């Protein structure tokens, strides 16, 4: 059995989120280039919590790709399986923020380098050396990277590595929502920890009620721990026959919600790394959700996500003032 060098290894996308940042003297909109991408955000938060992480994926050998590599390394995230593509450029996302802080995305990814990761480029021993393997569905939208993701899942499962899945559905990146659903259902078959949003669970299961949705998912695969993030309604954990809910922390100074779900997810994984997945209690789950909700709330007051994740001390201080 490979030695567990890493707490979490994630496969997927790192990209540049261009977020609105005021206007120029000429009245033109200014955009700030923020390193992002859901799996990268998750690892950045975990690193802030003292966990050892590494990223599997591909960026362009261009100014943005090199910036992302440098950013990950600066945060202490392993890049031994971050590939550089000489042909295809780094994926870009333009984030349009609404007044309540929610957002919409326009992607420049036709193709983007993250889609070009091949199965033969995935380092099996890296996955085998992790306690948790984490993935999403941006790495399942197109053939090449889909095969890389499936290979990684097979390696993780065969090696007894715990598998965490956040579908993170981005509709514009799929040929059709039917194809998206097919790939999410494929991913569920491997999953030990599922983080899913309120909208995603309703879309996936056709159930308005989240508990009914969870029942449907568990009929397909008995996933031990399912987290439903409900935005302004807080979050829920479904563990064995327990349902635990925690209220949100709503900020007056919310700027945008980019990275909130990833921050939440990372804090859940951190709790599982510290406490295991076998004997979680109602009290422990409530504490886990409360901490994760608080961390997610903090990130909504900042532009971008990957480089500005809160520390454990930030979250503890926030809870002391808002608990």
Regions found by a protein language model. Name each.
Residues 1-9, 154, 210-323:
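Conserved phosphate-binding/catalytic region of the ribokinase-like
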Residues 14, 138, 167, 263:
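Active-site metal-binding loops of divalent metal-dependent hydrolases
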Residues 52-135, 316-323:
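Conserved N-terminal subdomain of the carbohydrate kinase-like
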Residues 125-126, 186-187, 219:
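Structural alpha-helical scaffold elements that stabilize or flank donor/cofactor-binding regions
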Residues 140-216, 233:
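Conserved beta-alpha-beta core of the PfkB/ribokinase-like small-molecule kinase fold
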